[in-house]
């Protein structure tokens, strides 16, 4: 399939995305702690305001575009993976192939649409 043919490229794109994602949101590189600090428990506990960080990050069109591209690559990976699961357990007959192809596409689509909705909502001004 097309997904299996481009698995190496989609996989490398997802790897670069994961590194970037960890760099940006876990290591918090580029975020001023004073600007993105939230206080919880009556001001006694200080933590990063992840909501503000996400809105600031996805307000950048290029950041959002790369995120969306990586998630579309993830769709291809998930679809291929779910199809492979059915084949691995021996459920690869012509009779049920349309069913597991549907399940693979539906699973990948639900996961990816959920992830893509965040940057799209920020870009459209739904999340501010």
Regions found by a protein language model. Give the residues of each.
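Membrane-embedded alpha-helical bundles that constitute the cytochrome b-like, heme-associated redox core
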Residues: 1-128
């Amino acid at each position: 399939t097309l997904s299996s043919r481009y698995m190496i490229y989609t996989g490398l794109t997802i790897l670069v995305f994961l590194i970037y994602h960890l760099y940006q949101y876990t290591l918090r590189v580029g975020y001023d702690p004073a600007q993105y600090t939230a206080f919880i428990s009556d001001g006694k506990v200080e933590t990063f305001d992840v909501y503000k960080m996400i809105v600031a990050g996805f307000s950048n069109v290029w950041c959002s575009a790369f995120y969306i591209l990586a998630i579309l690559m993830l769709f291809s990976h998930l679809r291929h993976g779910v199809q492979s699961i059915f084949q691995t357990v021996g459920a690869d007959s012509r009779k049920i192939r349309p069913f597991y192809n549907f399940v693979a596409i539906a699973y990948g689509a639900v996961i990816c649409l959920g992830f893509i909705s965040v940057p799209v909502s920020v870009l459209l001004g739904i999340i501010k």
